Amino acid sequence: MSEFTKIAILGGSFDPVHKGHIQIVKQAKSDLDLDKVILLPCQRSPHKDNNTIANERQRVEMLSLASNQHDWIEISDWELNQENPSYSLLAARHFKETYPEAILYWIIGNDQWKKITTWYNIAELAELITFIVFTRDKECPLDLSLIHI
């Protein structure tokens, strides 16, 4: 284990949660030697159409069932208790305050990476966390020019 606690956050509607979500966090844990992954269900993403089918309690329960074999996965309802819209920056500030000595990572898909410059106050967010970007099998490689936010 490193000198600092390494924590990654995966936010999303998780409606429904699926094997891909768990595969991603397992891969991130393995590749980066993460100590913890926080699954952060949101009320409403400002970047997606949100017509959720499952309610908040059901989505948290789905996450709990999907992750119960992994003691390094934590489910946080913090964002569910915030006002809309739900910005990643506010969650990053919260977790930086909660874990001041930790190195924080934010897991996103290539679809969101392509829109990263439209995220609320992205410059401050990028100072608080390091992005982990996953691509789907058939997606083209990352546009690394976006790294210079």
Protein language model features and the residues they cover:
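N-terminal catalytic cores of NTP/NDP-binding nucleotidyl/phosphoryl-transfer enzymes
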Residues: 4-33, 38-43
